[in-house]
């Protein structure tokens, strides 16, 4: 029969042996992770930059629409694609729906042409749109009249009606 001291030594040896095996596995795994991986080949694309057409509204002359994109290149997987876009409805469409301008105040009325003008400088161009740097717009000169506030005119009408009823 084995003595308790022998059994204790055997357990210590087994524990040490298992710890040693565990350490070997950990070190081996760590070194395996450090192995040099073959570098991924960087694909140099022969594809050109995307060139986008103007945004074409789905209905009307503003709102949601689409634009076509194309690019050149012998080994391009995709040479055409369609992208959704939006034309803001408050932009001046006569200068291109993708060009946003900051306008100055209206100038004085030209008596010879009966027009007043103002200029706008380019504020923003969507999707590299080809926009003019400055634009000028004209509109007919109109009578300068200050509209009365509606609240006052309604109040006067009510008072007038009350006086008419009192007279009747």
Curated annotation (Swiss-Prot):
Start and end residues of each stretch annotated as Chondroitin sulfate A binding: 147-168
One GO CC term, this protein: extracellular region
Positions of the UniProt region annotated as Disordered: 139-168
Gene Ontology MF terms in the entry: chondroitin sulfate binding; growth factor activity; heparin binding; integrin binding; protein kinase binding; protein phosphatase inhibitor activity
Biological role stated in the UniProt entry: Secreted growth factor that mediates its signal through cell-surface proteoglycan and non-proteoglycan receptors. Binds cell-surface proteoglycan receptor via their chondroitin sulfate (CS) groups. Thereby regulates many processes like cell proliferation, cell survival, cell growth, cell differentiation and cell migration in several tissues namely neuron and bone. Also plays a role in synaptic plasticity and learning-related behavior by inhibiting long-term synaptic potentiation.
Organism for this UniProt entry: Sus scrofa
Record-stated family: Belongs to the pleiotrophin family.
Primary location: secreted
Source superkingdom: Eukaryota
Pfam families, A to Z: PTN_MK_C (PF01091), PTN_MK_N (PF05196)
Residue numbers spanned by region Chondroitin sulfate binding: 92-99, 123-131
Post-translational modification summary for this protein: Phosphorylated by NEK6.
Summary of subunit composition and partner proteins: Interacts with ALK and NEK6. Interacts with PTPRZ1 (via chondroitin sulfate groups); promotes formation of homooligomers; oligomerization impairs tyrosine phosphatase activity. Forms a complex with PTPRZ1 and CTNNB1; this complex inactivates PTPRZ1 protein tyrosine phosphatase activity through PTN interaction and stimulates tyrosine phosphorylation of CTNNB1. Interacts with ITGB3 and ITGA5. Forms a complex with PTPRZ1 and integrin alpha-V/beta-3 (ITGAV:ITGB3) that stimulates endothelial cell migration through ITGB3 'Tyr-773' phosphorylation.
Protein name in the entry: Pleiotrophin
GO biological process, alphabetically ordered: bone mineralization; decidualization; dendrite arborization; dendrite regeneration; estrous cycle; integrin-mediated signaling pathway; learning; leukocyte chemotaxis involved in inflammatory response
This protein's UniProt keywords: Disulfide bond, Heparin-binding, Mitogen, Secreted, Signal
Signal peptide: 1-32
Subcellular location(s) of the protein: Secreted
Disulfide bonds: 47-76, 55-85, 62-89, 99-131, 109-141
